[in-house]
Structures are given as C-alpha cells and as structure tokens.
Design a protein with these regions (language model features):
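Conserved HxN/HPN-centered segment at the entrance to the catalytic loop
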Residues: 77-92, 96-97, 102-105
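ATP/Mg2+ or Mg2+-diphosphate-binding catalytic cores
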Residues: 368-473
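Conserved short submotifs of the Hanks-type protein kinase catalytic core
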Residues: 100, 118-126
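Active-site activation/catalytic loop segments of kinase-like enzymes and analogous catalytic loops
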Residues: 280, 307-348, 364-384
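Active-site acidic catalytic loop and adjacent metal/ATP-binding pocket
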Residues: 33-44, 246-312, 445, 451
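ATP-dependent phospho-/nucleotidyl transfer catalytic cores
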Residues: 106, 110, 129-156, 163-267, ...
Length: 473
C-alpha cells in the first residue's frame, strides 16, 4: 500500500505517458531485484510493464539524475538500446520521495528523500547474460564473441554519453573517477576501520588490523557464506586486498602525473547484470538488446579537473569476464577478445601508459569486487545483522583472481599482448573508420542529424562498417 502511494504520487496517471496507473488496484507491483544500492520493482497493468528503481536509504547520490540523462541520450541518439525513461511530476525524469504523503498517517521514514526512476520494461523479459562464464551459450566460441562485442560497447557508451557531460546540471557533484576514494570509503564502512589504517603504513598498522578483525570474527554466523568469509579473513585476505589497492593507487596516480589521460567523460560498469544480449549460434554472433543501470558512472569536466580513464572501464569489465567466478582462474583468451573489441573502436592506438594503466585497472576491478561483496556481509560482521536477505557470494575468490593474474603476468608480458592485438592491418582499418567518425562528430552534419533524430541510423552504419571488416577476417 505504501509503495503504491509513493509511486502514484511521483507518477500521477493523468500526467504520465507510461500507461500505468499506480493508484489502481489492478496494477500489480512486485519486487524483482535488490542490488547493493537500489530496490527494483516491476509494475504491470494490462500487459504494460514498467521498472521502478528506488535508491536505498543512505545511498542518495547526485549523479542519479545524470545517469538518467545518459539513458535517454543512448536511446535517442545512438544504436545502444535502452528503455524509455518516463517523466513524472513537473516533467522531471527522476523523482524524490517526499517526507509525507497526503492521506497517509506517519512519515515515509524508510524511503523519504530517496530517488525514484520509472522506465519501460521489455514485455518478453530481459535477455540476461549469465553470471557464470560456463553458462554462456556457444561454449568457448560464444564466450569470445560476447567478450569482443562488450569491448566495443564500452567505447560506444562513453562516446555517446559524452554529449550529456557537455551540459551537466549545475551544482552536480562528480563521482570519484579513479575509484580510489570510493573504494577506500567502502573498505572503511565494511570493516569499521579508519582511513589511515587502510593505508597499512607499517607493521604496527598490520597488527592493529589483524587484532581488529579477530575481534569482529565471532559476530559471523554459521551460514556457508559467513563461514567462508571468516576463513578468508583469518588467512589474511583483507591485508592482501589492501596491499594491492594501495599499490595500484600509487601506480595509477604516478602514471597520470607523467602521462595525463584525455578527458573521457563517462564510465559505465559493463557486467552481466547491466547488459542484455541474445546469441545467434548459426553465425556465432551476439546482439546487445538492452542496456541499463547507468548508476556506476564517473565523469569529469574541464571545470572540476577530473580526468576519467576509459581504460578503467575496460579493466572493470575484464575483472568480471576474464576470470572464473568460482575458481578464480584467469582466462587470457577472454581478455584478448574483450580488448580486441575495445581497440576496434579507438581512433588511435593505446599508448604505453594507457596499456600499463589497463593492467592495473584489471586488478583494481577485482579489488573493488572484493569490497562490494564484503559489504553484503558487513552488517553481520559488525554484529548488526539485517533481516534483508541478499545473495552473498564469497569475497575470497577475488584474492585468488589477483594471484592467478599475477602468475600469468610472470610469463606473459601484458603490453606485448595488447601491442600484438592493435598492430594488425585489420585494426588499422578499424581506426580509419573511427577517425572519420571523430571528424563527423565535430562537424555541422553531426548537429543536423542530431536535430533530425537520425543519429541512431548513422551509428548503425558505423557498427556495420566494423562488422564488415571482422567478417572478412
């Protein structure tokens, strides 16, 4: 009843073109997902479906509005498929839950102040990419074809949404582009430690961390997830992760001082839960059919000085798709395929600094996953278990992933692998196409097509030109 009133207030039927009347008892509302930062509900009325996302208490972020704008930008001006975002009260694309609602006794203590967005839903469901690599259709061939498609998708999303960044809402606070401030904050909150202690400056810090963790371990229960988490902490997983995190921060910051990155405004976390795709086994080809959840964006402008890195996004994607989620094994062929698709969409080769940063960002992606997975167990670890039950995968696998990657690097220079991929005649032809695309995006013709609404057709032609080169291969 409370949710129905919240949704009806934010999206009044008479003012909304969504086609869903939330005040009607005929409208069915069900929870379909609970992620780390948000609840997702599915509303259905007369076969019309819509997704409603509510940001969880404590996670209100100013870039929610920006991510909604990016969703609309992709839908209207590119070949990237997204759902339509509906406008609510005052024609706004995102809503805020009020403190009180007329006719409702008591305030909305749980949801008050949270952001809501409403988007259409696919009538036949979402084309989900399996979380487990072995479940991806087509076996190894299907995996590699998907990896290549996702590599190019990373660049397409950033390029398309950069237009939104040029017109950021005033007063919008930027996210943390390099990922270190956010990562350190999550580590502090997960394990109730100070920022200073996350730095592990000396042996005294390490002893203090070990003592602190030992003090928390009795809080963990007897579930398989909690027991596995306890075993990982006892063998020093958190120290391994923090050591890796601190070294990566040093490496990347030093790299950016010596070789500043170009300002690439948009980063989107490309992982199975954020992309829908279908597989054509006859030609071993994937088509991306849905793109959503742009909440994990970092962006920068010339005014705030943030320099976001496109290779960071590729590294994050590789941390999902180039490692076995259960054994932690590194799959070099998956990494090569994803990097190949990424390189095909760049107008120039990656330079040495970018390649080294990519290697670091793969590991940072793994470290980030450890922190986020730990957060699902954090309340129990701190003696404050919650009644909200979520899937809680073992964070310890990410320590294994880091070790597996480092073992591979000992005999396989990462830079040599990337250089071999980007130094083929076919790759030069891909770059020629992208150089022409850069010229187009800086021409009057671009603005004409944007005004006409014909940019998606241009984007589709660009996709076809790249596909033609790959078919000849």
């Amino acid at each position: 009843m409370l949710l129905r009133q919240i949704f009806a207030h934010a999206y009044p039927f008479e003012n909304s073109d969504s086609g869903v009347d939330f005040s009607s008892p005929d409208t069915k509302i069900q929870a379909v997902n609970s992620g780390r930062l948000s609840f997702v509900f599915l509303a259905e009325q007369n076969r019309i479906k819509a997704f409603l996302k509510i940001v969880k208490p404590g996670f209100v972020r100013d870039n929610i509005a920006f991510s909604v704008l990016c969703t609309e930008e992709c839908r209207l001006h590119s070949s990237i498929p997204t759902f339509q975002t509906y406008r609510g009260k005052n024609a706004e694309l995102h809503q805020t839950v009020p403190e009180h609602l007329e006719g409702l006794s008591g305030e909305l203590s749980l949801f008050s102040g949270q952001s809501i967005t409403l988007t259409e839903a696919a009538l036949d469901g979402i084309d989900e990419i399996p979380e487990t690599l072995t479940e991806i259709p087509g076996g190894r061939r299907g995996q590699l074809a998907l990896m290549e498609k996702l590599g190019g998708y990373i660049v397409k999303v950033s390029r398309t949404c950069s237009v939104v960044t040029d017109n950021l809402p005033k007063g919008l606070e930027t996210a943390d582009p390099a990922g270190f401030a956010t990562g350190r904050q999550v580590a502090r909150e997960d394990f109730e430690i100070s920022e200073y202690l996350t730095q592990l400056h000396n042996s005294s810090d390490r002893k203090e961390l070990q003592y602190h963790i030992q003090h928390l371990l009795p809080n963990l229960g007897n579930s398989p997830e909690a027991q596995s988490f306890r075993e990982g902490l006892q063998r020093g997983d958190l120290e391994v992760i923090l050591d890796c995190f601190n070294q990566l921060e040093k490496n990347i910051h030093e790299s950016l001082i010596d070789n500043p990155a170009p300002n690439v405004p948009v980063l989107n976390e490309v992982k199975p839960a954020n992309v829908g795709a279908v597989y054509d086994a006859a030609v071993n080809r994937w088509e991306i059919t849905q793109s959503f959840d742009f909440d994990n964006m970092g962006f920068g402008t010339s005014e705030n000085g943030d320099q976001t890195l496109l290779e960071k996004d590729l590294g994050r994607t590789l941390s999902f798709f180039a490692f076995d989620p259960e054994s932690g094994e590194f799959y070099a062929d998956n990494a090569k395929a994803t990097i190949k698709g990424y390189l095909e969409r760049l107008p120039e080769k990656m330079n040495e600094a970018e390649i080294h940063r990519l290697q670091d960002y793969i590991q940072l992606g793994i470290v980030t996953s450890y922190f986020w997975r730990s957060s699902y167990l954090a309340e129990e670890l701190q003696g404050k278990p919650t009644e909200i039950l979520l899937a809680r995968p073992d964070p310890g696998v990410h320590v294994t992933q880091i070790r597996s990657f480092n073992t591979w690097l000992k005999t396989n220079p990462f830079a040599d692998m990337v250089e071999a991929l980007q130094s083929t005649p076919q790759m030069e032809r891909h770059r020629d196409i992208e150089r022409e695309a850069v010229l187009f995006r800086n021409s009057p013709d671009y603005h004409t097509k944007r005004a006409e609404g014909t940019l998606p057709a241009y984007d589709t032609e660009l996709d076809a030109a790249h596909d033609k080169i790959n078919c000849i291969e």
